[in-house]
């Protein structure tokens, strides 16, 4: 992301909209090249670094859109243990942490930049068939649907 941001800054072309959409879901335990848990690093920290480095390129009236997920309901962000060093790794908790971080980032970004005419939002894109779910099998998805239905009818 740092290299990408550097190239964008060197070009100097402004943006009307930045959509932070890179992501992974329910991955096996692993780390990014920078040593962060894969989902938190990919889904949140990558966006955070890129956007904060190129914020000067977002025009007045521009927008930042963070693709989050209803999966944010699985977990709050745990900044005391973002890499699962003290608790067992759970891919859905990790996903939830990253998606909660997307939302919190959008809220904080909006607060910091709205007076300059730049706004931010986090959105749930809906359920779609995509490579995002490549680490999830059908039984896991069915279990999630059943859990959600139980919550909605309780």
Tell what function each PLM region has:
Residues 85-86, 139-151:
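A short C-terminal helix-loop "cap" of Rossmann-like NAD(P)-dependent dehydrogenase/epimerase domains
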Residues 37, 90, 142, 151-154:
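Secondary-structure junction/capping motif
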Residues 98, 122, 145-154:
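C-terminal helical subdomain
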Residues 1-136:
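Rossmann-fold NAD(P)H-dependent dehydrogenase/reductase core
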